[in-house]
UniProtKB/Swiss-Prot annotation:
Family: Belongs to the DASH complex DAD4 family.
Keywords: Cell cycle, Cell division, Centromere, Chromosome, Chromosome partition, Coiled coil, Cytoplasm, Cytoskeleton, Kinetochore, Microtubule, Mitosis, Nucleus
Gene that this polypeptide is encoded by: DAD4
Organism of this sequence: Kluyveromyces lactis (strain ATCC 8585 / CBS 2359 / DSM 70799 / NBRC 1267 / NRRL Y-1140 / WM37) (Yeast)
Signal peptide: none
Keyword Nucleus among UniProt keywords: yes
Role, per record: Component of the DASH complex that connects microtubules with kinetochores and couples microtubule depolymerisation to chromosome movement; it is involved in retrieving kinetochores to the spindle poles before their re-orientation on the spindle in early mitosis and allows microtubule depolymerization to pull chromosomes apart and resist detachment during anaphase.
GO CC aspect terms: cytoplasm; DASH complex; microtubule; mitotic spindle
GO biological process: attachment of spindle microtubules to kinetochore; cell division; mitotic sister chromatid biorientation; protein transport along microtubule to mitotic spindle pole body
Name of this chain's protein: DASH complex subunit DAD4
Pfam families associated with the record: DASH_Dad4
Keyword Coiled coil attached: yes
Compartmental location: Nucleus; Cytoplasm, Cytoskeleton, Spindle; Chromosome, Centromere, Kinetochore
Coiled-coil ranges (or none): 18-53
């Protein structure tokens, strides 16, 4: 005897499988975008550190040469 719910169950499973496949594709895209954002953030962090080091160097040089002035 055939299970009366078999067709309904197989349809539900097919929908679940389709939804999981779409979810996996979305997660892959999200991971790619996060990698891209992280790369840009690393570049921004490096640039920020370079600017901070430059500012500290200029500040040190101005103090060493006694040419540092108070802000206006």
């Amino acid at each position: 005897m055939e299970n009366p719910y078999e067709k309904v169950q197989s349809n539900i499973l097919a929908r679940i499988i389709g939804n999981v496949e779409r979810l996996n594709q979305s997660v892959v895209i999200l991971n790619q975008e996060l990698r891209r954002v992280n790369t840009k953030n690393k570049n921004l962090e490096l640039m920020s550190q370079m600017c901070e080091n430059y500012r500290e160097s200029v500040d040190f040089q101005l103090q060493a040469t006694s040419k540092k002035q108070d802000p206006l």
